[in-house]
């Protein structure tokens, strides 16, 4: 612990001697944008999973102050896993997706959204552990062969929307993914 503290102090001294200055407004703008992105995502997710957000619920979810970073990171890793056929990246991405779902559930609970909360929580727990991820991957392979509908195409849609900055669309696609998993 002392080593880390000394390292942080040295880093601070070195950065101040070189005139490196972190603009606190820039950091807060980034956090604010991430919260806005999360809010748009949460509203889109509700639409994708077919939860009706009326009046005050919509306003409450729109005012969420959670960060979109877990979902953003998850889509980046899943995209990398799909492009490079990297099981490790895909698994890490699914794990981050599950962690993001935990934040989403907390937002919905805080706003009084009761529909599907337990199901979304169960899915978030499932994709944050190794066994659940393996089951999801096996199920995905079977689903592609039997139904010609794959979660992969929904994930690609979410990734594409996220890349374009369409966080509502990204949320809709993610809501559809979770909706499909809930029906399994």
From Swiss-Prot:
It comes from the Eukaryota. Keywords: Glycoprotein, Secreted, Signal. Transmembrane segments: none annotated. Glycans are attached at residue 129. Residues 1-19 form the signal peptide. Its main location: secreted. A motif (Cell attachment site) lies at residues 164-166. Belongs to the Sct family. This is Secreted protein B. It comes from Dictyostelium discoideum (Social amoeba).
């Amino acid at each position: 612990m002392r080593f880390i503290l000394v390292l942080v102090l040295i880093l601070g001294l070195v950065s101040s001697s070189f005139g490196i200055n972190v603009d606190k407004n820039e950091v807060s703008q980034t956090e604010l944008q991430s919260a806005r992105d999360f809010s748009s995502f949460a509203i889109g997710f509700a639409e994708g999973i077919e939860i009706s957000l009326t009046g005050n619920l919509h306003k409450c979810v729109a005012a969420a102050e959670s960060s979109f970073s877990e979902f953003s990171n998850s889509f980046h890793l899943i995209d990398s896993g799909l492009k490079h056929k990297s099981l490790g990246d895909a698994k890490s991405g699914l794990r981050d997706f599950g962690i993001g779902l935990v934040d989403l559930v907390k937002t919905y609970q805080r706003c009084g959204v009761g529909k599907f909360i337990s199901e979304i929580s169960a899915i978030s727990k499932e994709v944050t552990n190794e066994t659940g991820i393996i089951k999801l991957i096996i199920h995905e392979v079977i689903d592609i062969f039997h139904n010609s509908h794959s979660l992969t195409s929904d994930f690609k849609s979410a990734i594409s929307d996220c890349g374009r900055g369409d966080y509502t669309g990204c949320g809709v696609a993610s809501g559809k993914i979770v909706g499909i998993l809930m029906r399994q």
